[in-house]
């Protein structure tokens, strides 16, 4: 593997090998990350990357599209079957571009949209001022009840009645509870708004049938294809409304994109096929079991979990009672081979670059085959590290760093990722 890269560009070869080592021997707990199968990776690295295919299957602006048409048709068919949708667009390069396409298809610049506040668990593209969504549209953010730390649906309704948004966005990047899509649709209908659900984080759970399917209530659904879906990096748009489908297709191409990434679209098709298996369903069940177990283990050790737990693949740990910042915790854990990300919490008092919490997700460690027993081990290691941080830069006592780094390596060696499947690379 990578022998041609090694010959042509030793510097990038070194990057590939060292990143492989980092993934193989480190604990990946970033909720938005996962490990794609070699089938997905091989497809992404194929000669399909050479082909331009502006347009849609059978309606291209270039010749020679017979085989890429077939790849995109398979991706569309499988996405529709997987999520029970009548229409699917598999061309978005990312989740952000999927969201942009829906906004521009259903609203005009200057129109009002509602989305969850970033500091309460939303996403940049749901109306953050620094993002295109916050610059192009008038944004009315909603949040969580500060006591329950779950979505305040009465407040969502009050804001919707007051501001009459064109689009209401449900979904987030750091919200651990199941969202009441029915309630959101009722609110949207009451004010004549479109309901858009961004299921990027929990799409894999939906595909496996262990999480409510937002398509039952949403006018349109967006997603990424990595994260819990465990596919290539990319976006997806689903709807049951033919008029919305037409508008979305025109907005993706020629509206905001040119040539689609055919190597990625083919890899999406592979990912969707993998997601139809019983093995994938069992995997998703274990992802949630692992998240619940790890959250419980943190609570046993005196940590506060935002909203008191999780229904999904992720949870937020409030570090305020431990007198450590999210930034320091992230650095401390990374020095021991454990990757998480700092994250704001509801009613955040610190900058997003410092934050008071960390977000933890179980998709990647579950892909390795880890179960509840290992979640207890991981929680114990994280607690040991965070209890031995000696400064605001996240420096860990040397003896603790050495001890935990060794334990992380041993745990990862018990659950190999790629090393027993890749030939020609010594790691």
Swiss-Prot record:
Its EC number is 2.1.2.1. Its cofactor is pyridoxal 5'-phosphate. It comes from the Bacteria. SUPFAM superfamilies: PLP-dependent transferases. It is found in: Cytoplasm. Keywords: Amino-acid biosynthesis, Cytoplasm, One-carbon metabolism, Pyridoxal phosphate, Transferase. Pathway: One-carbon metabolism; tetrahydrofolate interconversion; Amino-acid biosynthesis; glycine biosynthesis; glycine from L-serine: step 1/1. It is an enzyme of class 2 (transferase). Pfam families: SHMT (PF00464). CDD domains: SHMT (cd00378). The record marks 226 as: Plays an important role in substrate specificity. The keyword Translocase does not apply. Transmembrane segments: none annotated. Homodimer. Catalyzes the reversible interconversion of serine and glycine with tetrahydrofolate (THF) serving as the one-carbon carrier. This reaction serves as the major source of one-carbon groups required for the biosynthesis of purines, thymidylate, methionine, and other important biomolecules. Also exhibits THF-independent aldolase activity toward beta-hydroxyamino acids, producing glycine and aldehydes, via a retro-aldol mechanism. Belongs to the SHMT family. This is Serine hydroxymethyltransferase. It comes from Thermotoga maritima (strain ATCC 43589 / DSM 3109 / JCM 10099 / NBRC 100826 / MSB8). The gene is glyA.
